[in-house]
């Protein structure tokens, strides 16, 4: 029996955060046995905002090495760099022709990014969700892990796929209609200084962010200064509405130790101050990341291995993608290359 197909990508722009790890990358490793996983480093998406070429080059290799370091197995999953599989851009162009301007102009992320990068609001940024749709539809993905910021894009991918199928292949649909993958455990990590906002790797205030490769001393320092509250006496309780800072730290501690919120609350019942709890959270996060960081350094220094992973991944991905692209080209009436 074939496994459900999953597609997910990671951007090689900026340092990946612990939020990227807990919310996506660790999940990637856990899904490999039960799903047919397609994982890509989405460098085509990265250039929708201006990138330094050398920095993008290095960040792409960094992201690939991180995927491997967290446990993505190239023998179980298809791991590749997006620009190495030209079918993504080819299908993206076709899908552009079946996407309405009004649909794209309603995308919340475009509004947010165009405000942030007001000096470079390019067509690629506007059409970003269409390329994302191509990423998904090329592989017949049944499920797509998405955060709240990408949910609208997945809905658009579903609309584009349905529209194309209805025009060209209502009886035998070319595109699979993807569903969101909902993780059993919510691993949403919030900003350290303002726990009402999601942690973002691109946050200008670096005190808000813990990066995946961050120095242990820096991690502990940031957590020691993280937002708590002024409740007297101090109370460790998972209450997102009234104790957002403590709830965020509890989430990190739970992710790092495997303890439930109830167990954490019992462990710290009757505390006189938040300092000892913060100390334990910092040490637990460092212990969680240390093996990943060590494995990353080993893999990142083995360029021959990275090259082999990229080469094999691109070949596997392209073979799958080409099957879909041929069906699409035939459906719209393109003449096949002799």
UniProtKB/Swiss-Prot annotation:
Entry keyword DNA damage: no
Example of a GO cellular component annotation carried by this entry: cytosol
Compartment(s) where it occurs, according to its Swiss-Prot or TrEMBL record: Cytoplasm
Keywords on record: Aminoacyl-tRNA synthetase, ATP-binding, Cytoplasm, Ligase, Nucleotide-binding, Protein biosynthesis
Alphabetized GO MF terms: ATP binding; tryptophan-tRNA ligase activity
Renumbered ranges of motif 'KMSKS' region: 198-202
Keyword Protein transport: no
Binding residues annotated for L-tryptophan, in chain numbering: 135
EC number(s) stated in the UniProt entry for this protein: 6.1.1.2
GO biological process, any: tryptophanyl-tRNA aminoacylation
Highest taxon listed in the record's lineage: Bacteria
Annotated signal sequence range: none
InterPro entries: aa-tRNA-synth_Ic, Rossmann-like_a/b/a_fold, Trp-tRNA-ligase, Trp-tRNA-ligase_bac-type, Trp-tRNA_synthetase
Binding site for ATP: 11-13, 19-20, 147-149, 189, 198-202
Reactions catalysed: tRNA(Trp) + L-tryptophan + ATP = L-tryptophyl-tRNA(Trp) + AMP + diphosphate + H(+)
Short motif ('HIGH' region): ranges: 12-20
First-tier enzyme category under EC: ligase
S-S bridge residues: none
Subunit structure as annotated in this protein's UniProt entry: Homodimer.
Family in the record: Belongs to the class-I aminoacyl-tRNA synthetase family.
NCBIfam families: trpS (TIGR00233)
Function: Catalyzes the attachment of tryptophan to tRNA(Trp).
Official protein name in the record: Tryptophan--tRNA ligase
Lineage: Bacteria, Pseudomonadati, Pseudomonadota, Gammaproteobacteria, Vibrionales
Encoding gene per record: trpS
């Amino acid at each position: 029996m074939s496994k459900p197909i999953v597609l997910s990508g990671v951007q090689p722009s900026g340092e990946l955060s612990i939020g990227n790890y807990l919310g996506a990358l660790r999940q990637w490793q856990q899904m490999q046995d039960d799903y047919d996983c397609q994982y890509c480093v989405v460098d085509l998406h990265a250039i929708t905002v201006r990138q330094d070429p050398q920095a993008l080059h290095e960040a792409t290799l960094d992201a690939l090495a991180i995927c491997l370091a967290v446990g993505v197995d190239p023998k179980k999953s298809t791991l590749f760099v997006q620009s190495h599989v030209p079918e993504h851009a080819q299908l993206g162009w076709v899908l552009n022709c079946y996407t309405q301007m009004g649909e794209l102009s309603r995308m919340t992320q475009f509004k947010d990014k165009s405000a942030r990068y007001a000096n470079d609001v390019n067509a690629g940024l506007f059409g970003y969700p269409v390329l994302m749709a191509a990423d998904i539809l090329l592989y017949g993905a049944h499920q797509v892990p998405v955060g709240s910021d990408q949910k609208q894009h997945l809905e658009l991918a579903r609309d584009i796929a349905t529209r194309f199928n209805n025009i060209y292949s209502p009886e035998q649909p070319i595109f699979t209609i993807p569903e969101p993958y909902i993780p059993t455990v919510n691993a949403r990590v919030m900003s350290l200084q303002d726990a009402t906002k999601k942690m973002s790797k691109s946050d200008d205030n670096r005190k808000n962010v813990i990066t995946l490769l961050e120095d242990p001393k820096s991690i502990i320092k940031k957590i020691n200064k993280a937002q708590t509250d002024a409740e007297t006496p101090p109370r460790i309780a998972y209450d997102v509405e009234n104790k957002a800072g403590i709830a965020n730290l509890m989430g990190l501690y739970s992710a790092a130790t495997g303890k439930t919120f109830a167990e954490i609350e019992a462990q710290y019942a009757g505390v006189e101050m938040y300092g000892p709890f913060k100390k334990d959270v910092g040490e637990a996060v460092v212990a969680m990341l240390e093996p990943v960081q060590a494995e990353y350094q080993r893999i990142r220094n083995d360029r021959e291995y990275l090259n082999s992973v990229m080469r094999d991944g691109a070949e596997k991905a392209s073979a799958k993608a080409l099957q879909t692209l041929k069906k699409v080209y035939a459906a719209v009436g393109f003449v096949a290359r002799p």
